[in-house]
Amino acid sequence: MNKKVFVSGCYDMLHSGHIAFFEEAAQQGDLYVGIGSDKTINELKARKTINSDAERLYMVNALKVVKEAWINSGGGLLDFLEELNTLKPDIFFVNTDGHTPQKEALCKEMNIEYIVSKRVPHGNLPARSTTALRQECRIPYRIDIA
């Protein structure tokens, strides 16, 4: 039986960095993905999502490396607690941006292996982050003056 690997995040503006992260996590076993709800993201990041939680769920579930994805039911930084207790994963996989002492302590308490990955782009692709993409999107391609 394969190990259960859990990851959690926003996954708004899905990009090659997310895919590389999912592929790396899936090398450890069957990949389960918890997705932050629109409400949680708005509360944590004080902004609306580009893609609704329904769209993000559809896109993440469509990826062949993902065994199952869902919208996390809780709120705050540990919005996945209920799902984590239900899934009982063997591994909680995060990248350096997603690592927090609270997640690490929770995994120790629940006897879940906690793996912190470095952000490594796939092949010769550039490093990507949603924050950087959002900043690039703010630059207008043209300016209309009325």
Features from the language model and the residues they span:
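Nucleotidyltransferase catalytic core that binds NTPs
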Residues: M1-A146
